[in-house]
A protein has these predicted regions:
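Charge-rich, low-complexity N-terminal segments
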Residues: 1-137
Length: 137
């Protein structure tokens, strides 16, 4: 089994808010991240797939196809977007880095053909990242 990781970057803004909590509870729980005007991050996304080497191509996965899938499913949808308002997954889900990794997994996993999605890693900044391995990995 081989593991191959492709990296991409995108910028997005968001804020943390739980509509089931009072304004005071939201401010206490989320602090300055509860500002409805949002704040932004330059995210780094690492997508790792796993599989065997194709004897014909010598690849685990078609790198061009993986790049195009990441671009179509993630970057086109999330780059320079206000996640809370412009990305459907976050209409009812708080756009934490944890939830962002899950949403990206859910977008990418069904699109994988020759290799299986193994891990989604999302860096919010240089010293904070989340790894998600999916429900069945």
């Amino acid at each position: 089994m081989l593991y191959l990781t492709r990296k991409a970057e995108f910028a997005a803004s968001h804020y943390y808010h739980n509509p089931e909590l009072s304004p005071e509870e939201n401010r206490r729980l989320f602090g300055k991240c509860n500002n409805p005007n949002g704040h932004g991050h330059n995210y780094v996304l690492e997508v790792t797939v796993k599989g065997e080497i194709d004897p014909c191509s010598g690849f685990v996965v078609d790198l061009k196809q993986l790049k195009e899938t990441m671009h179509r499913e993630v970057l086109d949808a999330m780059d320079h977007r206000f996640l809370n308002k412009e990305v459907p997954e976050f209409a009812t889900r708080i756009p934490t880095t944890e939830n962002l990794a899950i949403a990206i997994w859910q977008r990418l996993a069904p699109k994988m053909t020759n290799a299986k999605l193994h891990q989604v890693r999302v860096y919010e900044n240089h010293d904070l990242f989340v790894d998600f391995y999916g429900e069945s990995s």
